[in-house]
UniProtKB/Swiss-Prot annotation:
One of its GO terms (molecular function) is RNA polymerase II cis-regulatory region sequence-specific DNA binding. Residues 365-390 are annotated as: Hydrophobic repeat HR-C. It is linked to Defects in HSF4 are a cause of forms of hereditary cataract (HC) in dogs. Mutations in HSF4 seem to be causing a recessive form of cataract in Staffordshire Bull terriers and Boston terriers and a dominant cataract in Australian shepherds. Gene3D superfamilies: Winged helix-like DNA-binding domain superfamily/Winged helix DNA-binding domain. This is Heat shock factor protein 4. It comes from Canis lupus familiaris (Dog). GO terms for cellular component: chromatin; nuclear speck. The gene is HSF4.
């Protein structure tokens, strides 16, 4: 049995050495346990060679346990630290399994230093449950200050909410006022500029193309009779033939707006429908009234519908008559061809002009002052066949029973007119004037001597129409070809 370790000094001192430190000092200094625990060569630390054997063989002799972990925990409680050597600090496990512990007051040969080794006393916890009076007073003051700031913030928030509500009400009121002002401004603009827009659009819609292709004006109100000036160039000759522009009839619907001859009666110093006379023109020529009779072909349904229409030229009064003849018949009459059928082409030869004939009275022409209907204004040779007949009337049937069996040409109409006089140098090269028929005699009515205006479409006669010289001809802008034939002689 091993000898008991050297007894630690037991003399009374100011502080006794703890039992664990006395046992450890004896254990390290025992030469019989140097193979398991010993001093280091420097004497400032001790080494444990084999931890497992040390725990099984040595610890039970000095301590009540054989647990190495408990031994190491007690060393740590007294301030011992584990020394890590260079060999143990590497990644490879060292060959020797030993542990080294070190304390500044645990040195070999200096036993008096053991009094300095003290067990670590855990720090006493402060009593948090207790509050000092000064701390409580300070905390109460801070809480009161925070409460005052909170009350001020709540009051400010309530004020901001009230101001926000007031602003929203003002915004709603301003929006309503803004919308009302917009509506008022819109109504004012509509009242101020609405008539102008309506007048401009109505004028644009009612604006008509000029009846004469080179000069003329338009009547602003085609629904009633107006006193409008006529071009000065047109008021010096009694008879005119002109190709009208398309869509000159205003009184008929779109299905009845077809082209046809226009016969116009120009009389001098005729009073206007409202009882006023025309004022003289700017050029010094006298204003002349113009009565227009437009002939429109029958509708496809076979019924000839007539309506009041107004020519694009400005006029005193305008009357539109139903179409008395078809386009083919009028073309045949104007060209002077007798053998004409509405269905076939024109292949008849030009007949020789007949001798002079007597001028029919105004009853025959239907130009009485009291009768202003379209049928009365047209000569009997241009009157329409009865509407009951389905077949179109031929040229000979239209001319009346007195002219059956012979051809009718415009030369007969030429013989009814008086002497012709050529136009002045200011007229167009294709215009011819007639002055004979327009001069009223002592036994004539002023209506009989009034000029007539025949308006024939350019599409009826092809490139040129062979017409007698008794009629003044105006060429269309599309075709400037001479309407007069080479054999026509404008001289009387």
């Amino acid at each position: 049995m091993q000898e008991a370790p050297a007894a630690l000094p037991t003399e009374p001192g100011p502080s006794p050495v703890p039992a664990f430190l006395g046992k450890l000092w004896a254990l390290v200094g025992d030469p019989g346990t140097d193979h398991l625990i010993r001093w280091s060569p420097s004497g400032t630390s001790f080494l444990v060679s084999d931890q497992s054997r040390f725990a099984k063989e040595v610890l039970p002799q000095y301590f009540k346990h054989s647990n190495m972990a408990s031994f190491v925990r007690q060393l740590n409680m007294y301030g011992f630290r584990k020394v890590v050597s260079i060999e143990q600090g590497g990644l490879l496990r060292p060959e020797r399994d030993h542990v080294e512990f070190q304390h500044p007051s645990f040195v070999r040969g200096r036993e008096q230093l053991l009094e300095r080794v003290r067990r670590k006393v855990p720090a006493l916890r402060s009593d948090d449950g207790r509050w000092r009076p000064e701390d409580l007073g300070r905390l109460l003051g801070e809480v009161q200050a925070l409460r005052g700031v909170q009350e001020i913030t709540e009051a400010r928030l309530r004020e901001l909410r009230q101001q926000n509500e007031i602003l929203w009400r003002e915004v709603v009121t301003l929006r309503q006022s803004h919308g009302q002002q917009h509506r008022v401004i819109g109504k004012l603009i509509q009242c101020l500029f609405g008539p102008l827009q309506t007048g401009s659009s109505g004028a644009g819609a009612k604006r008509k193309l000029s009846l004469m292709l080179d000069e003329g004006s338009s009547c602003p109100t085609p629904a009633k009779f107006n006193t409008c000036p006529l071009p000065g160039a047109l008021l010096q000759d009694p008879y005119f033939i002109q190709s009208p522009l398309p869509e000159t009839t205003l009184g008929l619907s779109s299905s009845h707006r077809t082209r046809g001859p226009i016969i116009s009666d120009i009389h001098e110093d005729s009073p206007s429908p409202d009882g006023t006379r025309l004022s003289p023109s700017s050029g010094g020529r006298r204003e002349k009234g113009l009565a227009l009779l437009k002939e429109e072909p029958a509708s496809p349904g076979g019924e000839g519908e007539a309506g009041l229409a107004l020519a694009p030229n400005e006029c005193d009064f305008c009357v539109t008559a139903p179409p008395p003849l078809s386009v083919a018949v009028v073309q045949a009459i104007l060209e002077g061809k007798g053998n004409f059928s509405p269905e076939g082409p024109r292949n008849a030869q030009q007949p020789e002009p007949r001798g002079p004939r007597e001028v029919p009275d105004r009853g025959t022409l239907g130009l009485d002052r009291g009768a202003r209907s379209p049928e009365n204004l047209l000569p009997p040779m241009l009157l329409r066949a009865p509407p009951e007949s389905v077949e179109p009337a031929g040229p000979l049937d239209v001319l009346g029973p007195s002219h059956q069996g012979r051809e009718w040409t415009l030369m007969d109409l030429d013989m009814e007119l008086s002497l012709m006089q050529p136009l002045g140098p200011e007229r167009s090269e294709t215009e011819l004037a007639v002055k004979g028929l327009n001069s009223p005699g002592p036994g004539k009515d002023s209506t009989l001597g009034a000029p007539l205006l025949l308006d024939v479409q350019a599409a009826l006669g092809g490139p040129a129409l062979s017409l007698p010289g008794a009629l003044t001809i105006y060429s269309t802008p599309e075709s400037r070809a001479n309407y007069l034939g080479p054999g026509a002689n404008p001289s009387p």
